[in-house]
Amino acid sequence: QILDESSPYKVAHLGLGYFDTKHDAEVAVFDAVHRNEIEAVAINPSTIYGPGDAKKGSRGAQLKVARGKFPFYPPGGVNVVHVDDVVDLCIKAFRSNKNGERYIACGENLTIHETFTRIAKLAGVKPPSIALPRSVIFGLGKIGDLLESVGSKGPINSDNAWTSTM
């Protein structure tokens, strides 16, 4: 489904804390805009890539792909945007004086398999070739949730499972 700046938030029923808190913050900001308490715009970036983000969540798997040590890929997709493009949009949005607007910062839609294949090709290694079924990913997410509940960390949690299969 193609989304634009007027598209409603449709994943609240999944209980994805990361997405829900970003959405709730945007609602609070736009409520204040509509009450003429502040001037603001919203920038909704897709998955941002650029220098300095190698320790960010999903980057661990991508680094393993680049090293030829990750044979798996999930069934989901991702939209990627470079950090420089997001910064440019922020500057343009600030200068636009269009109070209360929302802007989507995005690039190309790719499957995660396509993303991993591109990473492997650039690194000169074999791309992942084993598709992980959703059931396996969600099972790993539940195990990760359980480990988090006792103060440890699993490979993924339920939020990661959802986002890697969307």
Regions found by a protein language model. Name each.
Residues 13-42:
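Active-site Tyr-X1-5-Lys
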Residues 112, 156-166:
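Active-site loop of classical SDR/Rossmann-like NAD(P)-dependent oxidoreductases
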Residues 39-42, 46-79:
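NAD(P)-dependent short-chain dehydrogenase/reductase
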Residues 10-18, 72-76:
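A short acidic, glycine-rich active-site loop
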Residues 89-155:
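Mid/C-terminal beta-alpha module of Rossmann-like enzyme folds, strongest
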Residues 1-13, 34, 53, 63-66:
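Active-site "gating" loop of Rossmann-like NAD(P)-dependent oxidoreductase/epimerase domains
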Residues 24, 56-57, 73-95, 101:
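Substrate-positioning beta->alpha
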